[in-house]
From Swiss-Prot:
It comes from Staphylococcus carnosus (strain TM300). Keywords: Molybdenum cofactor biosynthesis. May be involved in the biosynthesis of molybdopterin. This is Molybdenum cofactor biosynthesis protein B. The lineage of its organism: Bacteria, Bacillati, Bacillota, Bacilli, Bacillales. The gene is moaB. One of its GO terms (biological process) is Mo-molybdopterin cofactor biosynthetic process.
Length: 170
Protein backbone atom coordinates (compact mmCIF):
# COMPACT_ATOMS: atom_id res chain seq x y z
CA UNK A 1 0.00 0.00 0.00
CA UNK A 2 1.15 3.49 -0.75
CA UNK A 3 1.05 6.25 1.85
CA UNK A 4 -2.19 7.63 0.38
CA UNK A 5 -3.78 4.19 0.32
CA UNK A 6 -2.95 3.79 4.02
CA UNK A 7 -4.48 7.17 4.84
CA UNK A 8 -7.60 6.59 2.76
CA UNK A 9 -8.49 3.05 3.84
CA UNK A 10 -12.24 2.50 3.61
CA UNK A 11 -13.88 -0.23 5.65
CA UNK A 12 -16.82 -2.20 4.28
CA UNK A 13 -18.64 -2.12 7.61
CA UNK A 14 -19.49 0.19 10.48
CA UNK A 15 -17.02 0.52 13.34
CA UNK A 16 -18.37 -0.63 16.70
CA UNK A 17 -16.90 1.61 19.39
CA UNK A 18 -17.34 1.92 23.15
CA UNK A 19 -16.41 4.75 25.52
CA UNK A 20 -15.56 4.09 29.15
CA UNK A 21 -15.08 6.95 31.59
CA UNK A 22 -13.14 6.11 34.74
CA UNK A 23 -13.99 8.50 37.57
CA UNK A 24 -15.18 8.55 41.15
CA UNK A 25 -17.06 11.81 40.56
CA UNK A 26 -18.42 11.98 36.99
CA UNK A 27 -22.01 11.39 35.98
CA UNK A 28 -23.38 11.19 32.41
CA UNK A 29 -24.23 14.88 32.73
CA UNK A 30 -20.81 15.98 34.02
CA UNK A 31 -18.66 13.60 31.96
CA UNK A 32 -17.10 16.18 29.65
CA UNK A 33 -14.27 13.91 28.46
CA UNK A 34 -16.42 10.89 27.62
CA UNK A 35 -19.11 13.00 25.99
CA UNK A 36 -16.47 14.79 23.91
CA UNK A 37 -15.04 11.45 22.75
CA UNK A 38 -18.53 10.38 21.62
CA UNK A 39 -19.09 13.70 19.85
CA UNK A 40 -15.74 13.52 18.03
CA UNK A 41 -16.41 9.93 16.96
CA UNK A 42 -19.76 11.00 15.52
CA UNK A 43 -17.85 13.40 13.24
CA UNK A 44 -16.45 10.34 11.45
CA UNK A 45 -19.82 8.57 11.47
CA UNK A 46 -19.03 6.30 14.41
CA UNK A 47 -22.04 6.25 16.69
CA UNK A 48 -21.89 4.90 20.23
CA UNK A 49 -24.77 2.64 21.21
CA UNK A 50 -26.16 3.45 24.69
CA UNK A 51 -24.94 0.09 26.01
CA UNK A 52 -21.43 0.95 24.79
CA UNK A 53 -21.01 3.96 27.06
CA UNK A 54 -20.33 3.59 30.77
CA UNK A 55 -18.83 5.32 33.76
CA UNK A 56 -17.05 3.23 36.37
CA UNK A 57 -15.26 4.15 39.57
CA UNK A 58 -11.47 4.24 39.81
CA UNK A 59 -11.41 0.53 40.63
CA UNK A 60 -9.21 -1.93 38.75
CA UNK A 61 -11.70 -4.80 38.93
CA UNK A 62 -14.65 -2.65 37.79
CA UNK A 63 -12.62 -1.33 34.85
CA UNK A 64 -11.44 -4.82 33.87
CA UNK A 65 -14.95 -6.28 34.05
CA UNK A 66 -16.43 -3.58 31.81
CA UNK A 67 -13.61 -3.92 29.28
CA UNK A 68 -13.95 -7.71 29.19
CA UNK A 69 -17.70 -7.43 28.64
CA UNK A 70 -17.24 -5.17 25.61
CA UNK A 71 -14.36 -7.26 24.25
CA UNK A 72 -16.64 -10.33 24.42
CA UNK A 73 -19.27 -8.38 22.45
CA UNK A 74 -16.78 -7.87 19.60
CA UNK A 75 -16.59 -4.10 19.94
CA UNK A 76 -13.87 -2.95 17.51
CA UNK A 77 -12.53 -0.05 19.56
CA UNK A 78 -12.71 0.91 23.23
CA UNK A 79 -11.68 4.37 24.33
CA UNK A 80 -11.17 4.91 28.04
CA UNK A 81 -10.94 8.38 29.54
CA UNK A 82 -9.53 9.08 32.98
CA UNK A 83 -7.38 7.26 35.50
CA UNK A 84 -4.15 7.50 33.49
CA UNK A 85 -2.14 9.70 35.84
CA UNK A 86 0.12 8.86 38.76
CA UNK A 87 -2.26 9.35 41.70
CA UNK A 88 -2.94 6.29 43.88
CA UNK A 89 -6.51 6.07 42.51
CA UNK A 90 -5.33 6.15 38.86
CA UNK A 91 -5.56 2.46 37.95
CA UNK A 92 -6.86 2.45 34.38
CA UNK A 93 -3.48 1.50 32.94
CA UNK A 94 -3.12 -1.33 35.47
CA UNK A 95 -6.50 -2.67 34.30
CA UNK A 96 -5.87 -2.22 30.57
CA UNK A 97 -2.30 -3.42 30.02
CA UNK A 98 -2.77 -7.05 31.20
CA UNK A 99 -5.51 -7.40 28.56
CA UNK A 100 -3.35 -6.22 25.66
CA UNK A 101 -1.93 -8.66 23.12
CA UNK A 102 0.30 -5.95 21.68
CA UNK A 103 0.99 -2.45 22.93
CA UNK A 104 1.10 0.33 20.34
CA UNK A 105 3.99 2.21 21.92
CA UNK A 106 3.89 5.00 19.36
CA UNK A 107 0.48 6.11 20.59
CA UNK A 108 1.67 6.92 24.11
CA UNK A 109 4.88 8.45 22.84
CA UNK A 110 3.13 10.71 20.33
CA UNK A 111 0.38 11.59 22.78
CA UNK A 112 2.88 12.78 25.38
CA UNK A 113 4.89 14.67 22.75
CA UNK A 114 1.81 16.44 21.40
CA UNK A 115 0.54 17.11 24.93
CA UNK A 116 3.87 18.73 25.75
CA UNK A 117 4.04 20.75 22.53
CA UNK A 118 0.39 21.78 22.17
CA UNK A 119 -1.46 21.47 25.46
CA UNK A 120 0.05 21.11 28.93
CA UNK A 121 3.80 21.54 28.61
CA UNK A 122 5.94 19.59 31.04
CA UNK A 123 2.88 18.20 32.83
CA UNK A 124 2.70 15.76 29.89
CA UNK A 125 5.22 13.55 31.67
CA UNK A 126 2.51 12.60 34.20
CA UNK A 127 0.44 10.91 31.50
CA UNK A 128 0.55 7.15 31.12
CA UNK A 129 -1.72 7.13 28.05
CA UNK A 130 -1.56 3.78 26.28
CA UNK A 131 -3.03 1.96 23.30
CA UNK A 132 -2.90 -1.61 22.19
CA UNK A 133 -4.60 -4.55 20.60
CA UNK A 134 -6.61 -7.40 22.04
CA UNK A 135 -6.84 -9.83 19.16
CA UNK A 136 -8.56 -7.84 16.40
CA UNK A 137 -9.77 -5.13 18.80
CA UNK A 138 -8.21 -1.83 19.90
CA UNK A 139 -8.09 -0.10 23.27
CA UNK A 140 -7.02 3.52 23.71
CA UNK A 141 -6.62 4.92 27.23
CA UNK A 142 -6.32 8.69 27.52
CA UNK A 143 -6.57 11.24 30.33
CA UNK A 144 -10.06 12.49 31.11
CA UNK A 145 -9.52 16.21 30.50
CA UNK A 146 -11.25 17.63 27.46
CA UNK A 147 -7.93 18.95 26.17
CA UNK A 148 -6.39 15.48 26.30
CA UNK A 149 -9.42 13.80 24.75
CA UNK A 150 -9.58 16.36 21.93
CA UNK A 151 -5.86 16.03 21.23
CA UNK A 152 -5.88 12.22 21.24
CA UNK A 153 -9.00 11.96 19.12
CA UNK A 154 -8.22 14.65 16.54
CA UNK A 155 -4.48 14.16 16.16
CA UNK A 156 -4.06 10.41 16.62
CA UNK A 157 -7.16 8.23 16.84
CA UNK A 158 -9.51 9.63 14.19
CA UNK A 159 -6.88 9.99 11.43
CA UNK A 160 -5.67 6.38 11.86
CA UNK A 161 -8.78 4.51 13.01
CA UNK A 162 -9.76 2.91 9.69
CA UNK A 163 -6.15 2.06 8.91
CA UNK A 164 -5.62 0.46 12.33
CA UNK A 165 -8.77 -1.66 12.03
CA UNK A 166 -7.85 -2.63 8.47
CA UNK A 167 -4.39 -3.78 9.58
CA UNK A 168 -5.81 -5.74 12.52
CA UNK A 169 -8.41 -7.58 10.48
CA UNK A 170 -6.57 -8.39 7.25
Amino acid sequence: MTKNEHVNVKLDRDIQCAVLTVSDTRTPETDKGGNLAKELLSEINVEIKPEHYAIVKDDKQAITEQLQQWLAEDVDVIITTGGTGIAQRDVTIEAVTPLLSKEIEGFGELFRYLSYAEDVGTRALLSRAVAGTVGEQLIFSVPGSTGAVKLAMNKLIKPELNHLIHELTK
